[in-house]
Amino acid sequence: MLALLGPNGAGKTTTIEILEGFRMRSAGRVEVLGVDLADGTEQWRARVGSVLQSWRDHGKWRVRELLAHLGSYYACYCTELVKRPWDANELLAVAGLTEHADKKIKMLSGGQRHRLDVAIGIVGRPELLFLDEPTAGFDPAARREFHDLVHGLAEQYGTTILLTTHDLNEAEKLAGRILILNGGRVIADGTAEELAQRIAGEDEVRWTRDGQHFVQSTTESTRFAFELFKQYGESIADLEVRRSSLVHQVEAGQSATAEANDYEEVAR
């Protein structure tokens, strides 16, 4: 599972829409499952599933009926290796919706509706599933249930998943690999552990002195602050220590491997 992590406006949705084939690239080459999107056929599209941030409601449909109907469009793309579509009853069980099979969609709760969205996204047994901000607006319980569902798809059924999120905890919990985006560019790439190691110890100390603002990156923020007060005393104001974290890297729009600008104030 791969997570595209970044703040609002970083380019996550634009990136995933290009990969899904919903938006044209402005330049370069984009391949998904070995196919240039400009040459993507219906056979290729049957190998890809998507769960969007928003949907057009099918409130009058019953859950099982809608899955069976949508699944029927994939039957002609069945192969010896991949039997399409997913059986509606089996899919309901996978998505945790069996007891709601005969409900009208408008009667589902928000969490149940998002489970149905995922079921719709995988009804054709895609090799690759795109999830765009899938847990936006979820309460903690619904978020945990959704995480369990996504984990099951990846681990039990071998579905490759690419999701976008601005939630670092979600990215760390779900993804084996994280790409951090900012301003439409990838500024970091690796596992959560690898990214954390790259910035380990690089705290950022901010302060003002005589009306001037200063910033210092250091691996020993406590000692640095002590020496700062030792040298300048009460003239130091607005002291702030920002501990190193991936969240800070995303918010600051910096590369996890780049060094922060160094404005040294302490005399050597």
Indicate residue ranges for each PLM-predicted region.
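Short, charged/small-residue-rich alpha-helical element at the C-terminal edge
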Residues: 194-268
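Catalytic Walker B motif of ABC-type/P-loop ATPase nucleotide-binding domains
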Residues: 129-132
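Conserved ABC ATPase "signature" region
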Residues: 68, 72-75, 82-100
